[in-house]
From Swiss-Prot:
Protein name: Glucose 1-dehydrogenase
PROSITE patterns for the chain: ADH_SHORT
Its EC number(s): 1.1.1.47
Oxidoreductase listed as a keyword: yes
Residues noted as binding NADP(+) in the record, renumbered to the chain: 11-35
Enzyme class label: oxidoreductase
Length: 261
């Protein structure tokens, strides 16, 4: 537990399911005030609110598409209107879909880039604007991936979005460090989320993924939420401009284990 997170206001995009849901619940247990964002499934967002209430937390749900500028502006303003301020912005919303690069339509490309990269930029911009105008030493956390470092065939749009996020985060961190605003990435590896449920339910596919992880197991959403809580806390007060990989060692070239290579 991080006592300094108590009373902080945290906005998490794409937080009605998966990693975002786990982060919302974790910050609620830290006694932060949480803004749950969803794009279309209000019932999922309401379910998260119920879970937050069960742990004694305080939260609201705000509908919005991170690819729509006015929706992102409204999301941040809703947090400020409801809770009086904003302290932590977590740009978590994202998507992926496999397509051979030579068959990828411009629409396929734009959909992923607009959600993963442009959406994170808009969230970062609106949060930082508020921090600067109100002299707040706030925190921005962007949800990147091991694929900001590891190439991923059939997912060139996704890899490009996360590679772009890496330098976006580093640039924002450098630009706003003098004002005490911290900007960091989290780079998850293989995590047990709904988007991966079908794949990991297949024993052969699961074993194949686990073979790429030196620690030998697929991570849980709560392990990513723990990283987010630390990065948002004063324990990480001197940390900015990094990607903190939470991947069981996946980015450490496991094929070279045991002296191979």
């Amino acid at each position: 537990m991080y006592k300094d997170l108590e009373g902080k206001v945290v906005v998490i995009t794409g937080s009605s399911t998966g990693l975002g849901k786990s982060m919302a619940i974790r910050f609620a247990t830290e006694k932060a005030k949480v803004v749950v964002n969803y794009r279309s499934k209000e019932d999922e967002a309401n379910s998260v609110l119920e879970e937050i209430k069960k742990v004694g937390g305080e939260a609201i749900a705000v509908k919005g598409d991170v690819t729509v500028e006015s929706d992102v502006i409204n999301l941040v303003q809703s947090a400020i209107k409801e809770f009086g301020k904003l302290d932590v912005m977590i740009n978590n919303a994202g998507l992926e879909n496999p397509v051979s690069s030579h068959e990828m339509s411009l629409s396929d490309w734009n959909k992923v880039i607009d959600t993963n990269l442009t959406g994170a930029f808009l969230g970062s911009r609106e949060a930082i604007k508020y921090f600067v105008e109100n002299d707040i030493k706030g925190t921005v956390i962007n949800m990147s991936s091991v694929h900001e470092k590891i190439p991923w065939p059939l997912f060139v749009h996704y890899a490009a979005s996360k590679g772009g996020m890496k330098l976006m985060t580093e640039t924002l961190a450098l630009e706003y460090a003098p004002k005490g605003i911290r900007v960091n990435n989290i780079g998850p590896g293989a995590i047990n989320t709904p988007i991966n449920a079908e794949k990991f339910a297949d024993p052969e596919q699961r074993a194949d993924v686990e073979s790429m992880i030196p620690m030998g197991y697929i991570g849980e959403p709560e392990e990513i939420a723990a990283v987010a809580a630390w990065l948002a806390s004063s324990e990480a007060s001197y940390v900015t401009g990094i990607t903190l990989f939470a991947d069981g060692g996946m980015t450490q070239y496991p094929s070279f284990q045991a002296g191979r290579g």
